[in-house]
From Swiss-Prot:
GO terms for cellular component: cytosol. The gene is proS. It comes from Streptococcus uberis (strain ATCC BAA-854 / 0140J). InterPro entries: aa-tRNA-synt_IIb, aa-tRNA-synth_II, aa-tRNA-synth_II/BPL/LPL, Anticodon-bd, Anticodon-bd_dom_sf, Pro-tRNA-ligase_IIa, Pro-tRNA-synth_IIa_bac-type, Pro-tRNA-Synthase_IIa_type1. The lineage of its organism: Bacteria, Bacillati, Bacillota, Bacilli, Lactobacillales. This is Proline--tRNA ligase. The keyword ATP-binding applies.
């Protein structure tokens, strides 16, 4: 493919509005362009990469018997009302009316559509299991689109749905998908973790998220690709290294999720779902009597602890939430933070919001800063983190402005449901007893769910079992963020290319090292001087030979400065660069492996053989 015939609008500088490196490089390298807020056009390079990713997915899904189809993106609202999600999905749902004023939505996901299609076609257990998927654009009205393709209003997604007679059959397909996802992400060149995830608005019970790990900016060996003029990092002057470190640190670490994982085992979970090792303690302290003490102007845990000269770990934090329009009190040890997702999941609530001060006063008879669990009406549900159960003679609000209670003891002074509702902290013991918890940032690229009968119950998707009894279909759901993977791959494979000029000046610039299976082309073939007839003839000959051998070649035939061509080549990020330059008359060309920065001069007649050797282990 001639580069002059493609739309690759590279930029001289990083776009000023980009905060994460993947967004900046996709724009600068000419992969995407923003059409409006949260909506992007995928230009030829990005489209080629996405098509390669789709091919990988189709190959892996064929292995597990998944069948591709295509459902409409424009969906009737009636189905979503029937499932109950029209009201509960929230403001992210695109809602519209046709000319007859009938309600429609733009599909953010397709559980209802696939369930009803199968409901109307499948009547017997003999027709199951069934495993269907599609790859299409989805729509969510994000309040604040950001970070390029990571948070958009239109995005490309693969969503699959499996249908089963029982949970045992679902378990088999769920495991098949887990292995297929691992194969897809591995082939895509991603560093990832499969972690315990939250089902969220999808419903269901078990789920696993696949998170692409966002690399820290401190490992120079990972981020820098040195030109052959620089033997090693130690050869770069300290002042230049400091500049490079500042450049790396200037970009936000992308990934809206925090992953908690064990330092010694395979345990990994989204921070929203992560737990730590817990064991109840035996209380040895003598229970003190409740005592009301004045705590003037103390509105926070830290202020109360300082005023009473105690540790925050001996206080009870009292929060009020409104869960599906009902008040719920949440209790935590004073220095802990509530995990809203854990609390919402435990309650089985569709909506969970922090209460207003007015709502708190109606329940407690006091304002924020003085709330506590003692002497609340029996009608008020109290959910306490399990660590609260270990407290003895604690301090809590007295439900009287400006006062607190000392000598508060769980069970004696208040009754609660003790469960895990806190956010874990880095360094705590892993829940499996092996190692301690470490944190990393991650980009969610896939998610699989055991939906159970959540949608078949609400939509009446039933079959007759072997005894002729009507039973609900058991379902699984499996999603991959196709366009998100493009961002995640670039985030992990962005590099700073460092070189040294003949005058001894050090230069560095951003580019991409695309993994082979997702690179838009295999080889970037560059002619230094397109007006040199010998060089052009050699380029044409090489291009034909390479393509005959099955290589996908992008030939830079533009009449541009060689520096501009090399800069664009680094940005675009193809795995191999072949340069036809000054030695074209001798039949000599340069082959450069982008990932390592290594280069070698070879006779043009030996290019194919040399490539086979150089790429054997890549």
């Amino acid at each position: 493919m001639k580069q002059s015939k493609m739309l690759i609008p590279t930029l001289r500088e990083m776009p000023s509005d980009a905060q994460v490196i993947s967004h900046a490089l996709m724009m600068r390298a000419g992969y995407v362009r923003q059409v409006s807020a949260g909506i992007y056009a995928y230009l030829p390079l990005a489209n080629r990469t996405i098509e390669k990713l789709k091919t990988i997915m189709r190959q892996e899904f064929d292995k597990i018997g998944a069948v591709e189809m295509l459902a409409p993106a424009l969906l009737t609202a009636d189905l979503w009302r029937e499932s109950g999600r029209y009201e509960t999905y929230g403001d992210d749902l695109y809602k519209l009316k046709n000319r007859e004023s009938s309600d429609f939505i733009l599909g953010p996901t397709h559980e209802e559509t696939f369930t009803t299609l199968v409901r109307d076609a499948v009547k017997s257990y003999k027709q199951l299991p069934l495993n269907l998927y599609q790859i299409q654009a989805k729509y969510r009205d994000e309040k604040r689109p950001r970070n390029g393709l990571l948070r958009t209003r239109e995005f490309i997604m693969k969503d699959g749905y499996s249908f089963h007679q029982n949970y045992e059959d679902l378990d088999v397909t769920y495991e098949d998908y887990r292995k297929a996802y691992e194969a897809i992400f591995t082939r895509s060149g991603l560093e990832f973790k499969g972690i315990i995830g939250d089902g969220g608005a999808m419903g269901g019970k078990d789920s696993q998220e696949f998170m692409a790990i966002t690399p820290e900016r401190t490992d120079l060996n990972r981020w820098l690709v040195l030109d052959k003029s620089i033997p090693s990092l130690s050869d770069i002057p300290e002042d230049v290294l400091e500049e490079i470190k500042k450049e790396l640190a200037s970009w936000l670490i992308s990934g809206e999720d925090t992953i908690a994982y064990s330092s010694e085992s395979s345990y990994a979970a989204n921070l929203e779902m992560a737990s730590n090792a817990f064991s109840p303690t035996t209380k040895v302290a003598v229970a003190e009597d409740l005592k009301e003490v004045a705590t003037p102007d103390c509105k926070t845990i830290d202020q109360v602890a300082d005023f009473l000269n105690i540790s925050a770990e001996t206080t009870i934090k009292t929060l009020l939430f409104i869960a599906d329009e009902k008040p719920v009190v949440a209790l935590l040890v004073g220095n802990d933070q509530v995990n809203d997702v854990k609390l919402k999941n435990y309650l089985g609530a569709d909506f969970l919001d922090p209460a207003t001060e007015e709502e708190a006063f109606q329940v407690f008879g006091a304002h924020f800063g003085s709330l506590g669990p003692v002497n609340l009406p029996d009608s008020v549900r109290i959910i306490a983190d399990r660590n609260v159960q270990n407290l003895a003679n604690a301090v809590s609000g007295a439900n009287k402005d400006g006062f607190h209670l000392t000598g508060v003891n769980p069970e004696r002074d208040f009754k609660a449901e003790f469960v895990d509702i806190r956010e874990v902290k880095e360094g705590e013991a892993s829940p499996d007893g092996h190692g301690h918890l470490q944190f990393a940032r991650g980009i969610e690229v896939g998610h699989i769910f055991k939906l159970g009968t959540r949608y078949s119950d609400s939509l009446g998707a039933n079959i007759l079992d072997e005894n002729g009894k009507s039973i609900p279909i058991v379902m699984g759901c499996y999603g991959i963020g196709v366009s998100r993977i493009l961002s995640a791959v670039i985030e992990q494979h962005a590099r700073l290319f460092v070189s040294k000029t003949p005058k001894g000046e050090y230069r560095y610039s951003w580019g991409i090292n695309f993994p082979k299976e997702l690179a838009p082309f295999d080889i970037h073939l560059i002619t230094v001087n397109t007006k040199d007839e010998e060089a052009q003839t050699l380029t044409d000959k090489l291009e034909k030979e390479l393509m005959t051998k099955g290589y996908e070649v992008l030939t830079d035939d533009r009449n541009e400065r060689v520096g501009s061509k090399f800069s664009d080549s680094d940005l675009i990020g193809l795995p191999i660069r072949i340069t036809v330059g000054k030695k074209a008359s001798e039949g000599i060309v340069e082959i450069k492996i982008k990932a390592s920065g290594d280069s070698i001069e070879v006779n043009a007649e030996n290019v194919i053989e040399t490539l086979e050797i150089l790429t054997k282990d890549h």
